[in-house]
C-alpha cells in the first residue's frame, strides 16, 4: 500500500498549527535517561560499536586435515568457523604506552577472523589463479580443492534490506537502530583508501592428523606470497601458526615435540591448541552452546532466520576454554605487539618528517613549487584512484588505522590530519574523504569524557564533515557504501552527544534520506530515530514561558508523520499506526485531508507478514 501523504502536503501543514499538545507524559530534567527510555543509545555504546567494527582482520589458511577436523566436530565451513565467534570481546587486557606518552589500557579487544579465500581479488580485471588452486597443483592433498566457506567481504544491500525487512515484520521486535548500524559496519569492503579490511596477519592451521605436519606448515607459509590480492593490499605482513592436538586420538608428548620443532624453525609465533575430535552432543556432560558471532554478515543472519534446523551446536567446555585462551594469546601476544612495532617504526619513517615547521615547509614546497609538474611528483594514480603500493602516502593511512586499532586515538587523529592534507594536495578525493571521516570519529571518541568542544573545534569538525561528504558524493568515482556509512555515523554521533545537537543530527539524517543510500526499512528507522530525538526534548523542563521553546514539538510532529509514511511505504502498517495516531493528537484541529485518507486506508490494511522477495523499492 502506498501512502497518500505527499512531501508538499506534509511541509505545508507541519507549521500550520502550534496549538495542539502532542505529548502527555510527565516531564523530567534528566535528558540522558529520557533518551535511553525512548530507545536512543549512548555515546559509549556507539563508540563501542565502532571500536569493534574497526578491529584487526586475521586471515585463516587451513590445511585439509584441519578443515576435516572441524567438519567432524559439526562445523561444515572448516576450521575457520570454529575460530570465528571467539574473536568477539576477547578477555584479558594489556597496558601500552601511547605515541604521545600516555598509558593506554587495551581490553575487550576484537579480532575478525576471515577465511583467506575471501581476501583474494575479485576487484581486479585480470584473472589470476587462486592460492587454493596453486596449492592443489603443487602439493596435492595439502588443502581442500574447494573453499569450505562462502564468506565474502562487502555489504550486499539487498541482503541487508531483506534482513531488516524480515525483522521489521516481527511484532515483538523493536528494531533498534544500533543493530542496523552494527550490521552496516559488518560489510566494510576492501578498498585502497582505508585499510581496516586489509589483513594484519595470516594464521596458518595444521593438526596432529597431518602425516607430515612440519612440511605442510612450511609449504603453507611459503605459499602466502602467491595470494592474488589487489595491488594496494600489503601482503608483506605478520604470519602466525597454530598446531592442533587431538585430545581423543593422539599422544600429547609427541604433539608437543613436533610443536617445539616448529617453533625452533618458524619462530616464536606459534600456538598449541588442544581440542577433542569428537562431536559434542547433549549425551555428553560438560558441554556449552557454541557462541554466535556478533559480526555475522546479513547473508548469515538471513540464513539463521530461515533455518528450520533446531539442532543446537555444542562445544566441550575444555574446547571452549582452549579456543578463548588461543584468541587471547593471538590478540595480545601476536597482533598487539606487531601493530605496536609497525606504528613506532612507520611514525619515525613517514610521519615525523611531516611534523612541525620543517614538515610544513616541506609540504608547502611540494604543493606550490612542484604544482606545474604534479603528475610526475605524486605517487597517486588518478586512473586507478590509488597510491603506488608501498608509497609513503599509503603507509600514512595504514599507520593511522593501526593506531586506531590500538585505540591510540590522539595519535591516530594527528596522522589522519597529516594524511588528509597530503591527499587533498594530490587530488586523491576518496583518500581525503576517508581521512576526514576518521578525524571526525576520533575527535568524538576523544571528547567522550569531555563532551563540550570549543567553538573553533566544532566549526573545524563541521567543515571536515562537509568536505568528506562532498568528496564521497560529488565525484565521478563516488563510493556508495562509504557515503552511506559517513552520513549514518556522523548523524549518530550528533544524536548521541550528552547534550545532543538535535537540529544538526536531523540535518545529517535528512541528508542520508535524501541521498537514498539506504533501503526503505533503513530509511524508516532513520525517520523514526529523528522523530524520537525531537520528541525527547519535549520532556525537558525549561524556564521559558513559551510552551514550545526549545521543545521542537512541531518538528517532532512533522517527523512523526514522515515516520508513519516511511513505514507505510515499506508495507508494514502495524509499525506506522502508532505514529499516525500520535500525529492525530497534534494535528487534530486541522482538516488535513491527506492524513485522514491515510488513516482510513491504514484501517483497511491487513497486517500480515510478506515474503522478503516483495520488498518495495525506495
Swiss-Prot record:
It comes from the Eukaryota. Keywords: ER-Golgi transport, Golgi apparatus, Meiosis, Transport. The keyword Nucleotide-binding does not apply. Signal peptide: none annotated. GO terms for cellular component: cytosol; TRAPPIII protein complex. Pfam families: TRAPPC-Trs85. It is found in: Golgi apparatus, cis-Golgi network. GO terms for biological process: intracellular protein transport; macroautophagy; meiotic cell cycle; vesicle-mediated transport. Its main location: Golgi. Part of the multisubunit TRAPP (transport protein particle) complexes I and II. Component of the TRAPP I and TRAPP II complexes. TRAPP I plays a key role in the late stages of endoplasmic reticulum to Golgi traffic. TRAPP II seems to play a role in intra-Golgi transport. Has a role late in meiosis following DNA replication. Belongs to the TRS85 family. This is Transport protein particle subunit trs85-2. It comes from Schizosaccharomyces pombe (strain 972 / ATCC 24843) (Fission yeast). The gene is trs85-2.
Amino acid at each position: 500500500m502506498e501512502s497518500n501523504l505527499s512531501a508538499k502536503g506534509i511541509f505545508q501543514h507541519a507549521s500550520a498549527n502550534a496549538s495542539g499538545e502532542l505529548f502527555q507524559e510527565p516531564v523530567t530534567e534528566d535528558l540522558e535517561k529520557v533518551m535511553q527510555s525512548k530507545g536512543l543509545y549512548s555515546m559509549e555504546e556507539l563508540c563501542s560499536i565502532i571500536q569493534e567494527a574497526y578491529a584487526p582482520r586475521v586471515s585463516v589458511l587451513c590445511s585439509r586435515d584441519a578443515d576435516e577436523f572441524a567438519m567432524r566436530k559439526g562445523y561444515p565451513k572448516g576450521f575457520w568457523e570454529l575460530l570465528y565467534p571467539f574473536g568477539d570481546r576477547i578477555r584479558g587486557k594489556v597496558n601500552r604506552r601511547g605515541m604521545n606518552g600516555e598509558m593506554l589500557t587495551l581490553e575487550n579487544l576484537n579480532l575478525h577472523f576471515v577465511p583467506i579465500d575471501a581476501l583474494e581479488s575479485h576487484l581486479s580485471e585480470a584473472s589470476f589463479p587462486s592460492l587454493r588452486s596453486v596449492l592443489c597443483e603443487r602439493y596435492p592433498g595439502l588443502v581442500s580443492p574447494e573453499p569450505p566457506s562462502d564468506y565474502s567481504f562487502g555489504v550486499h544491500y539487498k541482503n541487508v534490506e531483506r534482513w531488516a525487512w524480515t525483522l521489521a515484520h516481527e511484532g515483538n521486535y523493536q528494531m533498534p537502530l544500533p543493530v542496523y548500524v552494527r550490521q552496516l559496519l559488518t560489510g566494510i569492503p576492501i578498498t585502497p583508501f582505508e585499510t581496516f579490511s586489509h589483513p594484519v596477519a595470516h594464521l596458518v592451521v595444521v593438526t596432529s592428523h597431518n602425516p607430515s605436519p612440519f612440511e605442510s606448515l612450511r609449504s603453507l607459509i611459503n605459499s602466502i606470497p602467491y595470494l592474488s590480492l589487489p595491488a594496494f593490499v600489503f601482503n608483506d605482513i605478520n604470519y602466525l601458526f597454530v598446531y592442533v592436538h587431538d585430545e581423543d586420538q593422539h599422544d600429547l608428548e609427541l604433539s608437543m615435540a613436533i610443536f617445539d620443532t616448529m617453533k625452533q624453525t618458524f619462530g616464536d609465533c606459534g600456538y598449541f591448541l588442544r581440542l577433542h575430535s569428537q562431536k559434542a552432543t547433549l549425551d555428553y556432560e560438560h558441554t556449552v552452546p557454541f557462541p554466535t558471532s556478533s559480526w555475522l554478515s546479513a547473508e548469515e543472519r538471513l540464513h539463521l532466520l530461515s533455518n528450520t534446523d533446531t539442532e543446537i551446536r555444542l562445544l566441550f567446555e575444555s574446547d571452549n576454554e582452549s579456543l578463548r585462551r588461543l584468541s587471547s594469546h593471538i590478540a595480545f601476544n601476536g597482533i598487539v605487539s606487531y601493530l605496536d612495532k609497525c606504528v613506532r617504526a612507520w611514525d619515525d619513517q613517514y610521519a615525523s618528517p611531516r611534523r612541525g615547521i620543517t614538515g610544513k615547509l616541506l609540504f608547502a614546497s611540494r604543493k606550490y613549487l612542484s604544482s606545474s609538474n604534479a603528475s610526475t611528483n605524486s605517487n597517486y594514480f588518478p586512473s586507478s584512484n590509488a597510491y603506488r603500493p608501498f608509497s609513503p602516502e599509503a603507509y600514512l593511512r595504514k599507520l593511522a588505522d593501526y593506531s586506531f586499532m590500538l585505540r591510540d586515538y590522539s595519535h591516530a587523529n594527528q596522522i589522519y590530519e597529516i594524511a588528509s592534507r597530503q591527499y587533498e594536495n594530490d587530488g586523491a578525493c576518496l583518500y581525503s574523504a576517508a581521512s576526514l571521516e576518521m578525524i571526525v570519529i576520533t575527535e568524538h571518541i576523544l571528547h567522550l569524557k569531555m563532551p563540550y568542544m570549543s567553538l573553533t573545534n566544532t566549526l573545524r569538525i563541521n567543515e571536515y564533515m562537509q568536505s568528506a561528504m562532498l568528496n564521497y558524493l560529488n565525484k565521478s568515482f563516488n563510493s556508495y557504501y562509504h557515503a552511506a556509512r559517513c552520513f549514518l555515523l556522523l548523524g549518530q554521533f550528533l544524536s548521541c552527544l550528552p547534550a545532543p545537537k538535535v537540529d544538526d543530527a536531523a540535518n545529517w539524517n535528512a541528508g542520508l534520506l535524501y541521498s537514498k543510500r539506504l533501503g526503505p526499512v533503513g530509511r524508516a528507522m532513520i525517520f523514526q530515530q529523528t522523530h524520537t530525538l525531537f520528541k525527547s526534548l519535549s520532556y525537558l523542563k525549561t524556564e521559558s514561558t513559551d510552551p514550545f521553546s526549545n521543545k521542537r514539538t512541531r518538528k517532532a510532529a512533522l517527523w512523526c508523520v514522515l515516520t508513519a509514511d516511511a513505514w507505510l511505504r515499506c508495507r508494514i502498517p502495524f509499525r506506522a499506526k502508532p505514529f499516525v495516531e500520535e500525529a492525530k493528537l497534534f494535528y487534530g484541529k486541522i482538516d488535513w485531508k491527506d492524513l485522514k485518507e491515510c488513516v482510513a486506508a491504514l484501517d483497511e490494511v491487513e497486517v500480515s507478514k510478506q515474503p522478503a522477495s516483495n520488498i518495495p523499492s525506495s
